[in-house]
Design a protein with these regions (language model features):
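Sec-dependent signal peptide recognition
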Residues: 1-4
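C-terminal motif of bacterial Sec signal peptides marking the signal peptidase cleavage site
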Residues: 7-10
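Bacterial signal peptide processing site
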Residues: 12-14
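Electrostatic cytochrome c docking/interface patches
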Residues: 17-44
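Short sequence/structural segments immediately N-terminal
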Residues: 38-47, 60, 83, 99
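Gly/Gly-Pro-rich "capping" loops immediately C-terminal to redox-active cysteine motifs
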Residues: 39-41, 55-78
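The canonical Cys-X-X-Cys-His
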Residues: 47-56, 88
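C-terminal capping alpha-helices of c-type cytochrome domains
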Residues: 78-100
């Protein structure tokens, strides 16, 4: 029974929590010209669409430059629009700098 529970997709068993949209995260988003609404949307989509299928490492595990490729690669599985991808990338790029 325990093995079955651990194998369920969509169950997050690690301790990773995506960082909130904070003043520091907003400041880190300046190179992407992302506003707080875009960052909040990106975080919400990340939580609802990415974390529903699998757990992810802390956002700091990847550099800001790696996130566009990673999101693009996974976007087909999550059926993400170009706008959703852009919001997620903006959030993850800023978040990856926030925790460093």
């Amino acid at each position: 029974m325990l093995v079955l529970l651990l194998a369920l997709p969509g169950c997050a068993f690690d301790k990773f929590t995506p960082p909130p949209v904070s003043p520091v995260l907003i400041a880190n988003a300046r190179p992407d010209h992302a506003d707080p609404q875009t960052l909040s949307r990106g975080r919400a989509i990340f939580v609802s669409r990415c974390l529903e299928c699998h757990t992810l490492p802390a956002v700091t595990k990847h550099s800001p430059g790696e996130w566009p490729h990673l999101v693009s690669r996974m976007s087909g599985r999550a059926n993400l629009s170009a706008g959703e991808q852009a919001a997620i990338v903006a959030y993850l790029r800023a978040a990856s700098l926030t925790g460093r």
